[in-house]
A protein has these predicted regions:
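N-terminal redox-cofactor-binding region of secreted/periplasmic oxidoreductases
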Residues: 1-562
Length: 562
């Protein structure tokens, strides 16, 4: 259930055994070979992830901390949170960043009860995923379904080159290979892209040869409405195709619907916290208090600036918006090295103003905020769940985010950065920014006019940035006043579409574990979860490659009879 990154891997691997009959269900559209939409293939992802045809449009989430000690407090505002609805899932619309996380992340998975998931056990599956076009050796795969590569500094735009100099002046070194040894430094971003075209999980794993297998059926535009049970045995799913309800039955059902929709399916089937299920009028099938709990994402804010004309991207070589990033250590007590990650964007949207704005996106990659949750609004399968991330609920996350704004705000004031940027300001991915980023003729006309004005006199540019682009606070405000900085960070922090951990793997004696280390849902039979839901903790990485690794490893477990 779910033809995203994990579902594409599973369909390919499980159908390789001719005696397995595999049905892949996906709510979104197909992306068959030769008919992949241009926006999906594009090296620049902004036109894909803001296309409403490729996402669940009614999904809203909260990101600010909700106080359970003050139930009368005004709830935080809800935000749009793009979740893919297309074959290939997130890999069809994401930023194509292909990294793995820290070895200590996976050792922590094992320590939290996911036996067999330490770094030494998962590295072979990361290598199995990839076909590295640049490097060989013990860290890299050469025969996988997903090509990975980097764009090296000689091809970076002037803004990215200047940022590299600023990083070095701050004491960080250049690292050629992000996915080799885990150490601090800046590097060319590793991307799942070949010859300036995205390679999604659907493109890589559901290739024409795989699609020709007699034992594999791919049913797109198919919405799963519920799970079918015979007692505690899951025996199939209910689905809607073209407005008509239908049922599919199978020996084993695998949920790969993502960390928001997979737990929602379990909850509607009566698997989850008993009190919440009763509140929703749902009969309790298996009381698993961890379903939907401890939701995580990586909190992020940005410090942006106007790019001087010579520093902007020249599209002759690449349409990529990100060329480099920095991994660094906060050095807070008890926190492992490489806990912070700052991406350098050389344009922030597809439109003319987006090409004039660059940013540091400051992300807490080793987050300790684990109080997010997914709950049902009702028992109706057509209602999106209530999703509360509670980002920055851990004080350590807040402190590191504030420190990041100070670091990179101050970096914008250095001579090397002032040679390529002007008018730096604190920024966030607000719904206002998102609305302007939607593809429309109106937005193009508005941003074309604004871009011409921004390239005009400096005084006019400053006025327009302060009145139309900024969210109220200046960089001076947040760098000189800690209360204003904290207020900005708490309000502006958003997730980066790395929802994870709502059906966590764990040990037999862990009451919050939803699945075992083979992905089997505890308390019932015939049902597994294989997606980012099962992560015991979100790794220090963009989550797509950890999901692909997880699907490869669990496919092996299923094929071996585990």
């Amino acid at each position: 259930m779910g033809g995203g990154s994990a579902g594409s891997v599973l369909a390919h691997r499980l159908s390789a055994r001719s005696h397995n009959k595999v049905l892949l269900l996906e709510a979104g559209q197909d992306t068959p070979h030769g008919k992949v939409p241009a926006a999906v293939l594009d090296s620049y992802p902004g036109t894909a992830y803001l296309n409403p045809n490729y996402t669940w449009n009614k999904l809203k989430v909260t990101t600010e901390v909700i106080s359970h000690n003050n139930p009368g407090a005004t709830p935080p505002p809800s935000r749009t949170y793009e979740q893919a609805r297309i074959l290939g899932g997130g890999s069809s619309i994401n930023g194509q960043l292909a990294n793995r996380g820290a070895p200590t992340d996976y050792d922590e998975w094992a320590d939290r009860g996911a036996a067999g998931w330490n770094w030494d056990n998962v590295l072979p599956y990361f290598k199995k995923v990839e076909r590295d076009m640049d490097f060989d050796g013990p860290w890299h795969g050469k025969e996988g379904r997903i090509p990975v590569r980097r764009i090296f500094p000689d091809l970076w735009p002037e803004h990215a080159k200047a940022v590299g100099k600023a990083f070095e002046q701050s004491g960080w070194k250049f690292i050629q290979d992000q996915n080799a040894e885990w150490e601090d430094g800046y590097f060319p971003i590793t991307i799942s892209n070949a010859y300036e075209r995205r390679v999604s999980a659907a493109i890589g794993y559901l290739d024409p040869g795989t699609r020709l297998r007699d034992n594999l059926t791919i049913s797109t535009d198919t919405i799963v409405s519920g799970l079918l049970f015979d007692g505690l045995q899951c025996v199939g799913v209910q689905a809607v195709i073209g407005g008509r309800p239908t049922e599919f039955r199978g020996r084993e059902i695998i949920l790969s619907s993502g960390a928001i929709h997979s737990p929602a399916h379990l909850l509607r089937a009566g698997i989850g916290p008993a009190a919440h299920l009763r509140d929703m009028g749902i009969e309790v099938r298996a009381a698993r208090p961890g379903v939907g709990q401890r939701l995580q994402d990586h909190p992020a804010v940005a410090v942006a600036a106007f790019l001087k004309p010579h520093a902007r991207i020249i599209h002759d070589y690449s349409r990529r918006h990100i060329y480099t990033a920095l991994r660094y250590s906060s050095n807070l007590p008890g926190i492992p090295a490489g806990d912070m990650f700052t991406v350098v964007t050389n344009k922030t949207s597809w439109h003319a103003v987006g090409e004039q704005i660059g940013s540091f996106i400051i992300t807490v990659y080793k987050t300790y905020s684990e109080t997010g949750q997914v709950r049902l609004r009702s028992a109706n399968w057509q209602d999106e769940p209530q999703v509360d991330f509670n980002l920055l609920s851990d004080q350590r996350d807040l402190e590191r985010m504030m420190d990041g704004v100070r670091r990179f705000g101050a970096m914008h004031l250095t001579p090397v950065m002032q040679s390529v940027t002007d008018n730096p300001f604190p920024a966030s991915y607000s719904d206002k920014v998102r609305q302007v980023g939607l593809l429309s003729r109106k937005n193009k006309l508005i941003t074309d006019a604004l871009a011409r004005a921004l390239d005009g006199p400096a005084a006019l540019r400053r006025y327009l940035i302060e009145t139309l682009v900024m969210e109220g606070l200046t960089l001076h405000d947040v760098l000189s006043d800690d209360d204003k900085l904290e207020g900005f960070v708490r309000k502006a922090a958003v997730g980066v579409w790395h929802a994870s951990c709502t059906c966590r793997m764990g040990a037999d004696d862990d009451p919050m574990a939803v699945t075992d280390p083979a992905g089997r849902v505890r308390g019932v039979a015939g049902l597994r979860v294989v997606d980012a839901s099962v992560f015991p903790v979100v790794p220090c990485a963009n989550t797509n490659f950890p999901v692909l690794m997880t699907a490869e490893k669990l496919a092996d477990a299923i094929l071996s009879g585990a």
